[in-house]
């Protein structure tokens, strides 16, 4: 399993799309947040309501979960156990946050997983959030949350990549694919 980890607007989703073009299967995570323009239920995320999410949590259907207090209310995120298990042992990619990584480390053998942190400056993140039209209050909340959530996260990552310009995401995907191939042999 290849895990992409990074702050908001670091380029994780763009990188995941490039890795899928290289033959990776996507592990679709679950959220209660509203869909953004261009997102597709079951492809971008499994979009569900709060009650369904909380029921899945109580019944042990989630391998990991977390929530964020946003300007629009509480949004839950998590990975369903079935989604982590049902794909073949071939190349799989999932985007997780620090809570997800730490939670999975206590539940699943991750010894053959490769965790890649996608790093970029806060200035770059601000520009990207503005370009995609995110609400300024919500953007500030996410930046503040990331400052706390990502403290010391690099220590659990196998590789750290910088994505400041977002112009050569294809090359970055090929590099990660090469490294993953070497890591999984």
Label the model's feature ranges.
Residues 24-36:
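Short beta-strand-centered segment that lines the nucleotide-binding/catalytic pocket of NTP-utilizing
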Residues 91-98, 110-132:
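Conserved phosphate-donor/acceptor-positioning beta-strand/loop module used by diverse small-molecule
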Residues 130-179:
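Small-molecule kinase domains that catalyze NTP-dependent phosphoryl transfer to phosphate-bearing small molecules
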